[in-house]
Every structure is written in C-alpha cells, then in structure tokens.
Amino acid sequence: MTLQEQIMKALHVQPVIDPKVEIRKRVDFLKDYVKKTGAKGFVLGISGGQDSTLAGRLAQLAVEEIRNEGGNVTFIAVRLPYKVQKDEDDAQLALQFIQADQSVAFDIASTVDAFSNQYENLLGESLTDFNKGNVKARIRMVTQYAIGGQKGLLVIGTDHAAEAVTGFFTKFGDGGADLLPLTGLTKRQGRALLQELGADERLYLKMPTADLLDEKPGQADETELGITYDQLDDYLEGKAVPADVAEKIEKRYTVSEHKRQVPASMFDDWWK
C-alpha cells in the first residue's frame, strides 16, 4: 500500500461520493451521537465559509428531525468575529441558509486583546501575529464550550480530509470539538453537499481563508499552505499529482500527526 493509499484510508476518504447519501449518513451520525450522549443539542461557530456553513446546516437538519420524532434538542449558531469581519455579509448569508434555532454573536476582540496585552506586560514581548491568530481560534473554542457546558450542548467541529491531511487547524482551537460530521470529505465533496442542499454558490465558491492574521487579513488558505485545494483533493481521491506536490502533502501529513492524536504519553507509539 502506498503512502497515498494509507492516508486515504486513515482519513476515510472515498474517491467518489453520492452527495444525497453523504448528507443522509452525516445527519444520521449527528442524530445518533446526540441521542447516545443524552446531550441537548449542538453549538457551532459560523464563519461564513464553506465548512461551517455545511456543518451548520447538517446540524439544523438533525435537530429538526429529532424534534419531529418527539425529542427535545436545539442548535445554537455562534458568530465569533474579531472586531469587524471582512466578509461579514457572507456570514449573514450563511446564517440565513442554515436557519439555526438560535444565533448569537460574540466579538472576541476584547478578550484576545486583553490577553495579548497581559502577555506582553508579563513576558516582555509581543505575541507574534501567527501566535495571536491561534489565540483567536482558541478563544472561539472556549466560547463554544462555555455555551455547550452551560446548556448541555455538544460542540461541532468542521475538520475534513483536506484540513486533516495538512494539519491546517489550530490545536485545541478549531481542532477542539466533540464530534466531526465532515470527516472524510474533500473540499470539492463538501461543495457538492452544499450544492445538493441548495446553498447560494457564493458560500462554496468563495476563497477559503482561516482569517486569523492581523497583518494579512483574509489571506487565502492556499497561499499559506503553498498547495491548492484542487491538488489536495486530487491526492486524497487517489488521483495522480506532481511529485513535488505529493511530497509537500506527505511532509505536512507526517509533521502534523500530533494534531490528529490525543496528547502523547509514554505508552503510545504513534509518535515514535
């Protein structure tokens, strides 16, 4: 088995999917998991990008079906901007599409800036823009877990195969969640699910961005990665890609393994 095949298997990627079937499977997963845990529903941060839009709509479909079956669950969508978000219009469009039971907005700027200032005062140096970006991601997850803990809700994560293979998420930030309904999907497969669900094409054709950096607001994921999502998707779907691209992907996969594992102990061997 080639490394490419090993990665596809580890990340549960299917080269070809039926969007209708995948939607049904993922809604059923959300329903089964929330029932099994006894939780009262879900909470998810909504950025206006493809991934949170898809996960949010799947979550809303799941809670509506459970209520129709006599259950009592809810879904809260959370906006978590740092000051004014450049693509706020897209976030509002996503919320309109998702139709969450409840939506709330937390501006994380005061919390992030207060921490950054205290860090500088105590340690005598400013956080790098990259590190501050990770603080933003972790404050967003703190907020979602506060809501979840207070109301008995599960935190949904938006990680999918194209992020997982590169480790392109913040450890214990957007990588922190209770369940991951998009696992195994490539970026283009996620787009296909949104198309099937009737989303505005603006929500899945827009340039993907983590938008965590003050110095480079709205920087494209592909710029930061040095790899395009089409290349990642081709690789994950078992297609041929240029040797240098495969090497980049496989190197990122190897060095980011710790992000896909629980914290290492001396009894684990995945890190050796």
Curated annotation (Swiss-Prot):
EC number(s) per entry: 6.3.1.5
UniProt: Mg(2+) binding residues: 51, 163
Keywords: ATP-binding, Ligase, Magnesium, Metal-binding, NAD, Nucleotide-binding
HAMAP family: NadE_ammonia_dep (MF_00193)
Lineage, uppermost ranks: Bacteria, Bacillati, Bacillota, Bacilli, Bacillales
Organism this protein belongs to: Bacillus cereus (strain ATCC 14579 / DSM 31 / CCUG 7414 / JCM 2152 / NBRC 15305 / NCIMB 9373 / NCTC 2599 / NRRL B-3711)
Protein's name in the database: NH(3)-dependent NAD(+) synthetase
Assembly notes: Homodimer.
The keyword Ligase belongs to this UniProt entry's keyword annotation: yes
Family, as annotated: Belongs to the NAD synthetase family.
Role description: Catalyzes the ATP-dependent amidation of deamido-NAD to form NAD. Uses ammonia as a nitrogen source.
Disulfide-bonded cysteines: none
Gene3D superfamilies in the record: HUPs (3.40.50.620)
Keyword Flavoprotein: no
Enzyme superclass (EC): ligase
Pathway membership: Cofactor biosynthesis; NAD(+) biosynthesis; NAD(+) from deamido-NAD(+) (ammonia route): step 1/1
CDD domains listed in its UniProt record: NAD_synthase
